[in-house]
Regions:
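S-adenosylmethionine
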Residues: 1-62
């Protein structure tokens, strides 16, 4: 799932308005930092990660 999210990061920007919220999930905890960096590089900010039992979800603001 991490690879798909990273590949789609630019699509998320196209379909959300400024100030919009993006929530992504199904990320293996070990790849969370990589996904956060990629999504931030597309213009999102304020990542709020949630981790449970090795899985992560992250909330971003555009």
């Amino acid at each position: 799932v991490a690879d798909v999210i990273i590949e789609m990061k630019d699509y998320f920007v196209r379909y959300l308005k400024k100030g919009g919220i993006l929530i992504i999930s199904g990320i293996i905890e070990e790849r969370m930092d990589e996904v956060i960096a990629a999504v931030e590089s597309a213009g999102f900010s304020n990542p709020e990660p949630y981790v449970k039992e090795g899985w992560a979800a992250v909330k971003f603001t555009l």
